[in-house]
From Swiss-Prot:
Function as written in the Swiss-Prot or TrEMBL entry: Encapsidates the negative strand viral RNA, protecting it from nucleases. The encapsidated genomic RNA is termed the ribonucleoprotein (RNP) and serves as template for transcription and replication. The RNP needs to be localized in the host nucleus to start an infectious cycle, but is too large to diffuse through the nuclear pore complex. NP comprises at least 2 nuclear localization signals that are responsible for the active RNP import into the nucleus through cellular importin alpha/beta pathway.
Name this polypeptide is given: Nucleoprotein
Chain span(s) of sequence motif Bipartite nuclear localization signal: 198-216
Classification lineage: Viruses, Riboviria, Orthornavirae, Negarnaviricota, Polyploviricotina
The protein's assembly and partners: Homomultimerizes to form the nucleocapsid. May bind host exportin-1/XPO1. Binds to viral genomic RNA. Protein-RNA contacts are mediated by a combination of electrostatic interactions between positively charged residues and the phosphate backbone and planar interactions between aromatic side chains and bases.
Keywords, in A-Z order: Capsid protein, Helical capsid protein, Host nucleus, Host-virus interaction, Ribonucleoprotein, RNA-binding, Viral nucleoprotein, Viral penetration into host nucleus, Virion, Virus entry into host cell
Origin species: Influenza A virus (strain A/Shanghai/16/1989 H3N2)
Subcellular location field: Virion; Host nucleus
Region Disordered, annotated ranges: 1-21
Biased composition (Basic and acidic residues): 8-21
GO molecular function, one term: RNA binding
Pfam families tied to this protein: Flu_NP
Positions of short motif Unconventional nuclear localization signal: 1-18
Gene Ontology CC terms: helical viral capsid; host cell; host cell nucleus; ribonucleoprotein complex; viral nucleocapsid
Amino acid sequence: MASQGTKRSYEQMETDGERQNATEIRASVGKMIDGIGRFYIQMCTELKLSDYEGRLIQNSLTVERMVLSAFDERRNRYLEEHPSAGKDPKKTGGPIYKRVGGRWMRELVLYDKEEIRRIWRQANNGDDATRGLTHMMIWHSNLNDTTYQRTRALVRTGMDPRMCSLMQGSTLPRRSGAAGAAVKGIGTMVMELIRMIKRGINDRNFWRGENGRKTRSAYERMCNILKGKFQTAAQRAMMDQVRESRNPGNAEIEDLIFSARSALILRGSVAHKSCLPACVYGPAVSSGYDFEKEGYSLVGIDPFKLLQNSQVYSLIRPNENPAHKSQLVWMACHSAAFEDLRLLSFIRGTKVSPRGKLSTRGVQIASNENMDNMESSTLELRSRYWAIRTRSGGNTNQQRASAGQISVQPTFSVQRNLPFEKSTVMAAFTGNTEGRTSDMRAEIIRMMEGAKPEEVSFRGRGVFELSDEKATNPIVPSFDMSNEGSYFFGDNAEEYDN
């Protein structure tokens, strides 16, 4: 990409960004991981969790949610001002699972937010350590991306459920900052913009007055983030049009949906990071590993090595398959919900199946679920190979894809051709090429028509043996192209509900 030099790497986004060299970045990311680990150890002590209970991913999720809630300034302010019955705005908590007399019991805990903030800051050398919080948000977002298909949300904004490969990060909170913006897919950005424009259409004052000015600058900022994800001049020019509109309305929504569709073939650049649950970092820190000293990267071998040596457990419902639960979490750990399943199977060393074939529901257990028959089992999060995460959409390419998901958004920088169902995508581009953006539309359609099946993305890039820490011997995988490549194939994944 031409503008590569002006962009900050996502490690720089993670680290509030002065230009740092690789060693400083690795130390800085390591420091963030140390903080999360120390916090988790302290919380396990507070909650009197055994080692096994502390490694239970459901307990990890509760603890992560508690600290995120304790630092959610806007929501905390809102709760103070709009008290609701039975909810203490100063407290946060959730279900903690303990092993009592040979069975799993659920216990609801409640803590002062102030106390949680104190423990968090203490674990992070007195800092608010926003980066660590964002890191946990991205882990939750990646888990949601792997667990749920956002069909309803897509349909509500006038998009097509088959565009789900563009929806990475769709459940990230708005406060997730630059690191959060980096991992949002094209569809996620488009959806946020469409919601904004719709509010403007329905509420005359949305763009007006003091607040309207803030709204407008947020709108333009989001347009610029989206523009920065596109890799072709025509798509970017289209975003300039949308951004400069005097009074954003249906024409802009049309343009946005058009550009989202085009991203199925002319893919945008979306960052991928392996963000692991706190219960992975905690035990590593308590075993004496010093992440800051050793250095850590979210996009290299480090998360793979960490998972090779970690024991994580999960509660399993009576009719769930533990191997399937493991796949779900493994994909979430590597931000791989929209990657080609053939490549994932190769890296993981065991077959990775589409969501609809997995006998597993989400990782979190609802408060009304019966605990009587809950078992627990070890999550298998190890891999056969490792590969470098990508921030590029790769070139585009077509091939038989599936009824559900009709494109992929690559996670790993590994040579392959990227599947998409060209005829299906192109069918959506008949008709409307008039209006202000007609020349851009024509240009975009021309480029999509020209996308070639034999074109290879990430040429020469391969996966690496886990012993090859310096990435010296790339192994270029060969795939059985007759297999299904899409995760949300013909989908019967549950919907994500807030």
